[in-house]
Swiss-Prot record:
Catalyzes the reversible oxidation of malate to oxaloacetate. The active site is at H187 (proton acceptor). One of its GO terms (biological process) is malate metabolic process. Pfam families: Ldh_1_C (PF02866), Ldh_1_N (PF00056). Belongs to the LDH/MDH superfamily. MDH type 2 family. NAD(+) binds at G12, A13, A14, G15, Q16, I17, G18, N105, Q112, T129, G130, N131. InterPro entries: L-lactate/malate_DH (IPR001557), Lactate/malate_DH_C (IPR022383), Lactate/malate_DH_N (IPR001236), Lactate_DH/Glyco_Ohase_4_C (IPR015955), Malate_DH_AS (IPR001252), Malate_DH_type2 (IPR010945), NAD(P)-bd_dom_sf (IPR036291). Its EC number is 1.1.1.37. Keywords: NAD, Oxidoreductase, Tricarboxylic acid cycle. This is Malate dehydrogenase. It comes from the Bacteria. It is an enzyme of class 1 (oxidoreductase). Substrate binds at R92, R98, N131, R162.
């Protein structure tokens, strides 16, 4: 394990997800015993609150927290970073149309993409958690032409984890018994959680469940709309679970997915499974040494095909919308 601190940037660091994420990062959930240097970006009005969060980080006396830098200037914060977790995004407010949301976030992720392109470390990897995550990642990637496209990913690990949890609850299996879960498409209500290639204790998950109606009518909508259900229950969006999934995704990306298993990541499509090239869409991937590879050769039946196509059509619509706005 290297003793050189890994420089990790977090945007929206004073927000709800940031508050859950920073203490996990500082305590070693991502890097274990390797030192970490946190670079925290916020908008100017939130810097005071962020100072309070840093006071709390100091008060934890984390042994592997090598340093914390905060600021509102992306180029300063991103300078030399090895990992950028783009959590901050403009939430959808009352009366906002989808185009308004894409436009507001487009400005944020255009600027951040350009800053990363200019000053990030040569080995940088960029994970986008802020929604709409897939299209925000596409905007950042397009504005960072010198960074390899494979270094950008959007978070669908939260959906992946939600799907595993629902399947475990249904079957009585432990979450550790469930392998090869896949989320296809967009991190939105059109996403497709696919149990037909998943395994529970080595057996096909759909066969173990043995209830196609439950898969279609309960499982898929529960996973796809889980975020809305959490807002309804707690009055604000899922933050701790999103932070946890952000760590899971980054850890597997940097250190590799488990043998005989795969994970879900939204990455740039090479045309696999009929997903239009260049879209940032969720796929089953294996990871090793900081690189990912789309799992090939999975049979896609008509039911799955229709679900994947519906979600990728939404992604194509979003790409068209941000093109019209001049963001890519």
């Amino acid at each position: 394990m290297s003793s050189t601190p890994l420089k990790v940037a977090v945007t929206g660091a004073a927000g709800q997800i940031g508050y859950s994420l920073l203490f996990r990062l500082a305590s070693g959930s991502l890097l274990g015993d390797r030192p970490i240097e946190l670079r925290l970006l916020e908008i100017t009005p939130a810097l005071k609150a962020l100072e309070g969060v840093v006071m709390e980080l100091d008060d934890c006396a984390f042994p592997n927290l090598a340093g914390v830098q905060i600021g509102d200037d992306a180029e300063q914060i991103f300078d030399g970073v090895n990992l950028a977790l783009l959590v901050g995004a403009r939430p959808r407010g009352p009366g906002m149309e989808r185009g308004d949301l894409l436009s507001a976030n487009g400005a944020i992720f255009t600027a951040q993409g350009k800053a990363l392109n200019k000053v990030a470390a040569d080995d940088v990897r960029i994970g986008v958690t802020g929604n709409p995550a897939n299209t925000n990642a596409l905007i950042a990637m397009t504005n960072a032409p010198d960074i390899p496209q494979a270094r950008f990913s959007a978070l669908t690990r939260l959906d992946h984890n939600r799907a595993i949890s629902q399947l475990a609850a249904k079957t009585g299996a432990a979450v550790t018994d469930i392998k090869k879960m896949t989320i296809w498409g967009n991190h939105s209500a059109t996403q497709y959680p696919d149990v037909f290639h998943a395994e529970i204790g080595g057996r096909n998950a759909a066969e173990v469940v043995g209830d196609q109606d439950w898969i279609e009518s309960t499982f898929i909508p529960t996973v796809a709309k889980r975020g809305a259900a959490i807002i309804e229950a707690r009055g604000s969006s899922s933050a701790a679970s999103a932070a946890s999934a952000t760590i899971d995704a980054a850890r597997d990306w940097l250190f590799g997915s488990a043998d005989a298993d795969w994970v879900s990541m939204a990455v740039v499509s090479d045309g696999s499974y009929g997903v239009p090239e260049g879209l940032i869409s969720s796929f089953p991937v294996t990871t090793k040494d900081g690189d990912w590879e789309i799992v090939q050769g999975l049979e896609i039946d008509d039911f799955s095909r229709a679900k994947i196509d519906a979600s990728t059509a939404e992604l194509a619509d979003e790409r068209e919308a941000v093109k019209e706005l001049g963001l890519i």
